[in-house]
């Protein structure tokens, strides 16, 4: 326990610090000392939540700790255990919620759960306190707001502004707000049913961003309650609620990119697409910024322009032709009530008027002021742009009223769309029928209103510059803010919408304001009449449009009830006039309102005050009426009850009295018809404007009762049958409806001629109804009072006598043609009831027929007229508004077929548009196209410039890249060229080398071939020489062998010197020893000698005794042969000698030299002979004669030695070879050349070297 207490204290301190640092999370309010305990208890519970957060990882310890902490917190409280339980449960959850707002979702999942059963029980216990809690706190804090808090928990956002302000509101509410707040905040986990039941409305109202219906919210709460035991499930439920709330908010979110800006950087749109986008954007801007700038500000000026009477003598109009019986035809073009065109009724009356200038016809006015005469009933109007012509375009058949006032017939743009735009200058009028049975049918006045070419140009020009002339808006408050917005939405482009708005405004102005100008010219009576005419259409519009007043709905119901009522027979003329069921029903409701305020002028003044207040509060009607919602409901109920009572009375009276009660129900029907047209199309502002004018007219009527009576009549007269066709706009519709009802009423009154007593009954019923309603005058709203004003004027007129009767009859007639004929004829009423209101145009003819059949027995005087109408087709067309409407359309179709063959051609070539308008339209179109094209081109230029800049940048980048690549390519090319040049150089070198090699190879081949040839030749020569040598050798050897063998002694002993000498002498051989013979075993030659020289060295051995016997010989100087060149090694070895002999001593020492004594001829000296003998003796060879020839050869030998010293080596080699040979046989030539053999002398032991022999 101590550990838990310490932890609890620590956690409480941390929670207090966190609350101090973040006061927006501090939900608890401490306002007094009494609330301090709950404050601390909540802090402790918050501490519990923080402790759970700190010890989140220890899941096994969370639940016991929470339980213990809750017990401890309960011990601190001084409140009853039930309250403690309640507060503990919700404060813990509250702290969890606030902690969850700063924790992530996984952290939130670890929080401990709260028992849903305990919560529900605690809620039941404290339900009373909860119900009594302040509504502000409940409205401010709701499950949805908690969901928002949880939804924003990830970003540590505490709460929404409304949620952060909750503590102050709770504190203001009182001390109980603490518990209430704690109860309300955790409602997303498990919301108590009591809270759900009580505060759903507050939730839906307080949270405009997230509106949830009660059923949806309860279903969500039930889901959350089912999952209340599990925190994860609770979180899942909250997630689902978040998703659903986001889904609720999605539909109201506006996509900022819904209107695509014309500037798309990526794609350049075409001119048409761009133009459409720009026009749409401009249209939206104009509608959002200036909703009333679509034609309102300049409407009055346009109306004044259009109020020119182009059939007036003042401007140059004249009568071109007329029936021959007509007198003073030009009088109808003069604004003088005392002048008139006179015609007997029996003749066919017609006339042709040339207008001042070509115009677009907008309205006709016709009047007959003469008392004792028949007024025109039906007349046909034809138009043409040239005269004379045999092709008149039938504009239509118009139905007048039996009234001696100006009757206006404005042309509906929808119905007369084929003709309104045509510029015509000639009008032909044919009177088809008339009211009454007087002899003369005079005509006092005819007016033609329209738009000339210049006016049309000015209108369109002004309409295009409305946005630029905002300073004029303040001048015209009569026009509503939303005036003509519907038309602008329907129009395809701004120009078309402007033109349509202008034309519609012109027509509306002609219908509404045109009467005032006419009144000014005519006088007080005409003024009052026109005023009332204008007020009637406005009255029903105002009543139908006002939001707080539910009169239109009730009026619709009323209409249906009237349809079901038993009909009473009415005069036939009245029924056809009121053929439009919708219009009649719509008119009936205003008449009912008028009946309520009929008898009192005080009601008029009060209604005036109400109208003023409504005009001033036109923009704040909802605000003005919120405070009096209960009053509004009370008044609405009272009005409905009064109308129901009146309706029931009229039904009963109609059953009692067939003709008269029939008049009563028509009064109601008139009322309905007046109210319903505005309910369909009229705007609030239109109502306000009309109410304003109505109030003004009513004031004038209050001051002039007589004028009022006339005005009532005029009101009934003005709406002619053409108006029954719904005019182009809501404003047009309501005046048409009213005028129709009034016209029909007037016709019915005239037809009813002598039924005035029957009309008194409806007046009385209306008075009674007024009395009943007077009991509850406060119950009516301002709109109802305004209508009361209008009706009071009518009541005053009714009080005047016959005029009143006429009015009542008109109401009756307009109200129920349907209810009257069903009584008489059962099938027709069934058909009319079965046919819907939308098919009113089709049902009208049938209604008219039935009315004729029913009415004929009722009114005797009207029978002949009805028969006349039925007899002629034109009259049949003119029977009534319903029948004439259908016939009128058929007639219009026929006329268009006759005139054009195709109605669409009217807008084509046959339709003549003014030169001004053609030029203006083309100029405007060109201006628009130029401006748009200029903007488009400017935008294109900007885009083009941007694109060009981007392209230039890209181009520069590409250029840089190309430059880099080119530079790199150039470098690569340079390197490649260098490599190529290097390779080329190497190739040239290679080619040169190859060429040189080829040349050298060729030369080598040549040399080789030459050498081969030389070798071959040398070989051949060698072979030849060898052969020759062999042959010579063979011959020489054979010869030498023969000679030698033959000449040599066969004994082996040497001959004696004497014998030898003798033999020499015998052979006569003369020899000369050039060299002293050296007796030695070897001899070395160092020089070279010619191979032809033969050196024979023979060792001679003589005994000393023989030496003595020898003859003396002459000693010669011994010459030593010195080699000029150094000794070279010989192949077979060196010549071996004892010692080289250098001088005589050496030479002598080596052997003894003997000089042969030659006995020469006597002529020679003894020395010579001795020498010769010695030589011969020495030689002893026959073949060596040249060596022993004598001393004559000595010099020659010396010279030869000198010459041949260069050849010593070769000779030495040969000598070596010869010396070394030891064999006794003679070497061959080959052996001698190679030096491989030693030549010896056989047995003699003398080594001989033989050269070339």
Curated annotation (Swiss-Prot):
Membrane-spanning intervals of the chain: 1012-1032
Subcellular location: Rough endoplasmic reticulum membrane
Signal peptide: 1-19
Swiss-Prot/TrEMBL GO biological process terms: ossification; positive regulation of collagen biosynthetic process; positive regulation of osteoblast differentiation; regulation of bone remodeling
Gene from which this protein is expressed: Suco
Biased composition (Acidic residues): 165-178
Keyword Transmembrane: yes
Glycosylation sites: 202, 236, 929, 956
Role played: Required for bone modeling during late embryogenesis. Regulates type I collagen synthesis in osteoblasts during their postnatal maturation.
SUPFAM superfamilies (UniProt xref): Galactose-binding domain-like
Biased composition (Low complexity): 121-145
Topology within the bilayer: Single-pass type I membrane protein
Chain segments annotated as coiled-coil in the UniProt record: 910-1010
Top-level taxon of origin: Eukaryota
Compositionally biased spans, kind Basic and acidic residues: 207-219, 241-255, 272-287
Post-translational modification summary for this protein: O-glycosylated. O-mannosylated by POMT1 and POMT2 and elongated by POMGNT1.
Positions of disulphide bridges: none
Listed name of the protein: SUN domain-containing ossification factor
């Amino acid at each position: 326990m101590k550990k838990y207490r310490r932890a609890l204290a620590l956690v409480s301190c941390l929670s207090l610090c966190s609350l101090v640092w973040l006061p927006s999370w501090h939900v608890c309010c401490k306002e007094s000392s009494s609330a301090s305990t709950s404050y601390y208890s909540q802090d402790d519970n918050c501490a519990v939540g923080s402790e759970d957060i700190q010890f989140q990882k220890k899941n096994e310890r969370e639940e016991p700790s929470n339980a213990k902490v809750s017990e401890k917190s309960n011990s601190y409280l001084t409140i009853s255990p039930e309250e403690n339980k309640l507060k503990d449960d919700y404060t813990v959850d509250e702290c969890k919620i606030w902690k969850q707002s700063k924790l992530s979702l996984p952290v939130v999942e670890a929080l401990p759960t709260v028992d849903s059963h305990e919560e529900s029980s605690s809620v039941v216990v404290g339900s009373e306190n909860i119900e009594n809690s302040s509504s502000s706190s409940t409205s401010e804090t709701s499950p949805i707001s908690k969901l928002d808090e949880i939804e924003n928990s990830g970003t540590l956002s505490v709460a929404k502004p409304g949620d952060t302000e909750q503590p102050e509101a709770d504190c203001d509410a009182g001390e109980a707000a603490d518990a209430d707040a704690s109860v309300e905040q955790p409602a997303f986990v498990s919301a108590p049913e009591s809270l759900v039941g009580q505060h759903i409305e507050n939730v839906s109202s307080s949270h405009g961003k997230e509106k949830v219906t009660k059923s949806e919210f309860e279903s969500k709460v039930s889901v959350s309650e089912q999952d209340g035991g599990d925190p994860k499930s609770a979180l899942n439920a909250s997630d689902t609620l978040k998703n659903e709330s986001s889904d609720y908010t999605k539909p109201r979110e506006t996509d900022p990119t819904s209107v695509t800006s014309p500037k798309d950087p990526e794609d350049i749109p075409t001119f048409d697409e761009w133009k459409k986008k720009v026009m749409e954007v401009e249209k939206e801007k104009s509608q959002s910024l200036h909703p009333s700038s679509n034609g309102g500000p300049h409407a009055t000026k346009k109306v004044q322009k259009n109020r020119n009477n182009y059939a007036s003598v003042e401007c140059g109009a004249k009568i071109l032709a007329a029936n021959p019986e007509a007198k003073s035809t030009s009088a109808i073009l003069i604004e003088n009530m005392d002048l008139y065109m006179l015609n007997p009724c029996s003749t066919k009356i017609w006339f042709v008027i040339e207008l001042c200038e070509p115009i677009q016809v907008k309205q006709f006015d016709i009047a007959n002021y003469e008392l004792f005469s028949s007024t025109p009933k039906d007349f046909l109007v034809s138009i043409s742009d040239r005269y004379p012509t045999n092709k008149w375009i039938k504009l239509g058949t118009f139905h007048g009223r039996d009234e001696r006032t100006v009757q206006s017939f404005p042309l509906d743009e929808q119905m007369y769309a084929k003709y309104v735009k045509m510029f015509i200058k000639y009008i032909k009028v044919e009177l088809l029928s008339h009211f009454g049975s007087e002899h003369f049918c005079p005509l006092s006045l005819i007016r033609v209103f329209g738009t000339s070419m210049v006016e049309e140009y000015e209108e369109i020009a002004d309409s295009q510059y409305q946005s630029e002339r905002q300073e004029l808006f303040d001048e015209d408050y009569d026009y509503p803010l939303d005036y003509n917005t519907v038309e602008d939405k329907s129009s395809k482009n701004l120009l078309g919408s402007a033109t349509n708005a202008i034309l519609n405004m012109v027509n509306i102005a002609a219908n509404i304001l045109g009467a005032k100008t006419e009144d000014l010219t005519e006088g007080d009576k005409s003024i009052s009449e026109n005023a009332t005419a204008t007020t009637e259409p406005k009255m029903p519009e105002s009543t139908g449009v006002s939001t707080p007043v539910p009169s239109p709905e009730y009026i619709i119901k009323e209409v249906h009830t009237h349809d079901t009522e038993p009909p009473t027979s009415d005069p036939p003329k009245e029924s056809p006039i009121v053929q439009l069921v919708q219009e009649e029903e719509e008119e009936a409701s205003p008449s009912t309102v008028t009946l309520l305020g009929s008898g009192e002028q005080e009601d008029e003044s009060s209604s005036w005050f109400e109208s003023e207040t409504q005009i001033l509060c036109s923009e704040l009607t909802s605000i003005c009426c919120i405070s009096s919602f209960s009053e509004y409901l009370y008044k609405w109920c009272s009005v409905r009850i009064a109308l129901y009572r009146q309706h029931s009375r009229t039904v009963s009276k109609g059953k009692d009295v067939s003709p008269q009660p029939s008049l009563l129900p028509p009064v109601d029907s008139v009322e309905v018809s007046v109210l319903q047209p505005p309910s369909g199309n009229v705007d609030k502002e239109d109502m306000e404007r009309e109410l304003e004018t109505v109030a003004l007219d009513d004031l004038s009527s209050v001051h002039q009762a007589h004028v009022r009576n006339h005005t009532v009549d005029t009101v009934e007269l003005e709406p002619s049958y053409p108006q029954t066709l719904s005019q182009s706009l809501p404003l047009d519709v309501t005046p048409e409806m009213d005028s129709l009802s009034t016209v029909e009423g007037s016709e019915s009154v005239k037809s009813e001629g002598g039924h005035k007593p029957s009309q008194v009954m409806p007046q009385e019923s209306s008075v009674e109804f007024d009395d009943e309603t007077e009991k509850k005058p406060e119950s009516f709203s301002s709109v109802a009072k305004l209508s009361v004003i209008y009706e009071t004027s009518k009541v005053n007129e009714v009080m005047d006598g016959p005029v009143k009767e006429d009015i009542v009859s008109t109401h009756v007639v307009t109200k129920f043609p349907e209810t009257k004929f069903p009584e008489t004829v059962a099938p027709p009423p069934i058909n009319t009831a079965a046919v819907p209101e939308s098919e009113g145009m089709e049902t009208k003819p049938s209604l008219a027929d039935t009315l004729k059949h029913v009415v004929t027995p009722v009114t005797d005087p009207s029978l002949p007229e009805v028969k006349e109408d039925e007899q002629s087709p034109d009259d049949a067309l003119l029977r009534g508004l319903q029948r004439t409407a259908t016939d009128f359309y058929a007639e219009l179709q026929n006329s268009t077929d006759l005139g054009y063959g195709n109605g669409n051609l009217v807008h084509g070539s046959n339709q003549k548009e003014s030169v001004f308008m053609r030029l203006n339209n083309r100029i405007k179109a060109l201006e628009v196209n130029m401006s748009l094209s200029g903007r488009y081109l400017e935008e294109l230029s900007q885009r083009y410039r941007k694109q060009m800049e981007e392209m230039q940048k890209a181009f520069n980048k590409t250029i840089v890249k190309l430059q880099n690549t080119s530079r790199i390519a150039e470098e690569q090319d340079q390197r490649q060229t260098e490599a190529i040049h290097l390779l080329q150089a190497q190739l040239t070198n290679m080619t040169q080398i190859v060429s040189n090699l080829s040349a050298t190879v060729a030369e080598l081949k040549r040399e080789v071939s030459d050498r081969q040839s030389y070798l071959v030749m040398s070989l051949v020569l060698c072979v030849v020489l060898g052969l020759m040598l062999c042959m010579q050798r063979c011959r020489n050897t054979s010869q030498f062998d023969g000679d030698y063998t033959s000449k040599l002694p066969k004994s082996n002993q040497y001959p004696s010197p004497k014998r030898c000498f003798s033999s020499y002498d015998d052979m006569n051989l003369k020899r000369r020893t050039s060299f002293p013979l050296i007796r030695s075993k070897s001899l070395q030659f160092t020089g070279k000698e010619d191979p032809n020289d033969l050196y024979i060295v023979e060792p001679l051995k003589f005994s000393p005794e023989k030496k003595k016997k020898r003859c003396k010989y002459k000693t010669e100087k011994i010459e030593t042969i010195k080699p000029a060149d150094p000794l070279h090694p010989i192949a077979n070895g060196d010549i071996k000698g004892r010692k080289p002999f250098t001088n005589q001593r050496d030479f002598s020492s080596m052997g003894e030299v003997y000089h042969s004594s030659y006995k020469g001829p006597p002529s020679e000296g003894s020395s010579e002979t001795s020498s010769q003998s010695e030589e011969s003796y020495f030689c002893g060879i026959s073949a060596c004669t040249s060596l022993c020839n004598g001393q004559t050869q000595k010099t020659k030998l010396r010279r030869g030695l000198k010459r041949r010293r260069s050849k010593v080596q070769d000779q030495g080699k040969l000598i070596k070879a010869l010396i070394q040979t030891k064999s006794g046989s003679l070497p061959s030539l080959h052996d001698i050349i190679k030096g491989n053999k030693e030549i010896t002398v056989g047995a003699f032991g003398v080594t001989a070297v033989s050269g070339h022999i």
